[in-house]
Regions:
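Catalytic Walker B motif of ABC-type/P-loop ATPase nucleotide-binding domains
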Residues: 63-66
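Conserved ABC ATPase "signature" region
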Residues: 16-34
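Conserved ABC ATPase signature
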Residues: 38-42, 46
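A short, surface-exposed alpha-helical micro-motif characterized by mixed small hydrophobic
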Residues: 104-106
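Helix N-cap at the start of a conserved alpha-helix in ABC-type nucleotide-binding domains
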Residues: 74-76
Length: 143
């Protein structure tokens, strides 16, 4: 229910609808059955899934995810990618901070390459080039 405060309001109890949304999002990320566990009892990947469920429960139109694949196993990574694609198909805007270059073309359609300033932005096909990667990750060329 931590993702629902904007919908619940201050000093109000969550509605049955809020509880159902929270349960749906927990199930969507494959964490049903873990609802009664403390966050410190979960693995890093399980924590990432719970954080994603919390974000999804907000029912926002724009999501900013800071390295959602960090510290997760391959199974969790696949689940997160599937959820992101599903969100995209529902018209949601998703901005992801991501540093694993090998998976950029597999997971994303558009990219903004930044090194203190915008180096390049556009479709992965057009922008994710060796030249732009070098400009982005080379300390002397990105500035």
């Amino acid at each position: 229910l931590m993702g629902r405060p904007g919908h619940i309001g201050w000093c109000r109890a969550p509605s049955q609808g809020d509880r159902l949304i929270a349960e749906e999002m927990i199930a969507r990320v494959g964490m049903d059955g873990y609802e009664d566990r403390q966050i410190n009892e979960l693995s890093g990947g399980q924590q990432q899934r719970v954080f994603l469920a919390r974000a999804l429960a907000q029912e926002a139109s724009v999501y900013l995810l800071d390295e959602p694949f960090k510290g997760v196993d391959m199974q969790t990574e696949k689940i997160i990618v599937h959820i992101l694609k599903e969100m995209e198909s529902r018209g949601k805007t998703i901005l992801v901070v991501h540093h694993a270059l090998r998976t950029v073309p597999l997971y994303f359609d558009h990219v903004a390459m930044i090194n203190r300033r915008l180096i390049a932005a556009g479709s992965v096909r057009d922008v994710f080039t060796e030249e732009n990667i070098e400009k982005t990750f080379s300390p002397s060329k990105g500035v």
